[in-house]
């Protein structure tokens, strides 16, 4: 099993190119199950989760041609199976995204209950209720979601009790081939959802309200789609993580290949802390702060502050003057990085879903263990500012979502090596 060894205290400088967004690529790969032609996806991040989902599609019978590490062609015209088995799905919760397209196109599917990051309950009930509303018969049998719609799915009004990104994406894909009009109320507005809608729209599906919390999809009545070539949007969470790396070490770094408006919640918070930000059309530059001030964060749905940046900003809070308050409203059990940050010397007090971080802390090296994808990135950030050499274990979590992390950080001047234990 690999680990990262990081010697802290080095200033960072230079530029880093942001990879394609994993959370945009996963629904787009799933959506190729709706295509009658060969679909070409570009700017895919070269990370484990993408490889896992492509392997799942191959298991279903899709032909996957890997042109290069960031480009694939997927042909789903001859799917042999509609069963997504446990041995693949257990590795990644996002595998649930094949539910909507399989059910919509083939009228049946079996999807193992998903795995992935252990960060609390993310019930798939919202997905299942939506499919039932669209006419599917859904049961849980032997750890599998078994769904059947022998007469096809029909349009319906889906009002989500709470905003769900993957739930919105699943319903959008299911609605694409359904009969009639589907309305989604309280829809997620994330850029990744927007890109999925735009790709389906380019493939011939009429969708109104893209980017809003109310979507209207006119189904194609079972007619498979003609996909155009797709370039995956840049990863706003990876971009935010590198901005935090610069902020942790109070350095100046430049990000290439970003969409600045996708990062507004993050960049506004960094400016509030005291950093300067120079904005370009598709690039950003972080400028050092004369003083790093404490801050408050409440995680919420886009366009609010993203839960996927909560752990990174908790690491940053250790280097700010005063007490920062971080409230996690989206997921339970998403403070598993706290105990590991405390091993490095962070002063963090937890009460329910709120963490108080006493800043100005001198972090000292230690052996720490990654518990999930974003928590592991917080440990990397903390190690960049810690005195001495920190070893981060179980970094397979990082490899699920960050492409060539150590190479990119090393290019910025970080002292970081990957080892095997």
UniProtKB/Swiss-Prot annotation:
Keyword NADP: no
Native organism: Wolinella succinogenes (strain ATCC 29543 / DSM 1740 / CCUG 13145 / JCM 31913 / LMG 7466 / NCTC 11488 / FDC 602W) (Vibrio succinogenes)
Alphabetical list of InterPro entries matching this protein: Enolpyruvate_Tfrase_dom, Enolpyruvate_Tfrase_sf, MurA_subfamily, RNA3'P_cycl/enolpyr_Trfase_a/b, UDP_GlcNAc_COvinyl_MurA
Catalytic activity: phosphoenolpyruvate + UDP-N-acetyl-alpha-D-glucosamine = UDP-N-acetyl-3-O-(1-carboxyvinyl)-alpha-D-glucosamine + phosphate
Gene Ontology cellular-component annotations: cytoplasm
Active site: 117
GO biological process terms on file: cell division; cell wall organization; peptidoglycan biosynthetic process; regulation of cell shape; UDP-N-acetylgalactosamine biosynthetic process
Residue numbers binding UDP-N-acetyl-alpha-D-glucosamine: 93, 122-126, 308, 330
Pathway membership, UniProt: Cell wall biogenesis; peptidoglycan biosynthesis
Record family assignment: Belongs to the EPSP synthase family. MurA subfamily.
E.C. no: 2.5.1.7
Positions of post-translational 2-(S-cysteinyl)pyruvic acid O-phosphothioketal modification: 117
Annotated protein name in UniProt: UDP-N-acetylglucosamine 1-carboxyvinyltransferase
Any Pfam family the entry gives: EPSP_synthase
Biological function: Cell wall formation. Adds enolpyruvyl to UDP-N-acetylglucosamine.
Keywords: Cell cycle, Cell division, Cell shape, Cell wall biogenesis/degradation, Cytoplasm, Peptidoglycan synthesis, Pyruvate, Transferase
Matches recorded under CDD domains: UdpNAET
This protein's record includes keyword Acyltransferase: no
GO molecular-function terms, A-Z: UDP-N-acetylglucosamine 1-carboxyvinyltransferase activity
Subcellular localization: Cytoplasm
Binding residue positions for phosphoenolpyruvate: 22-23
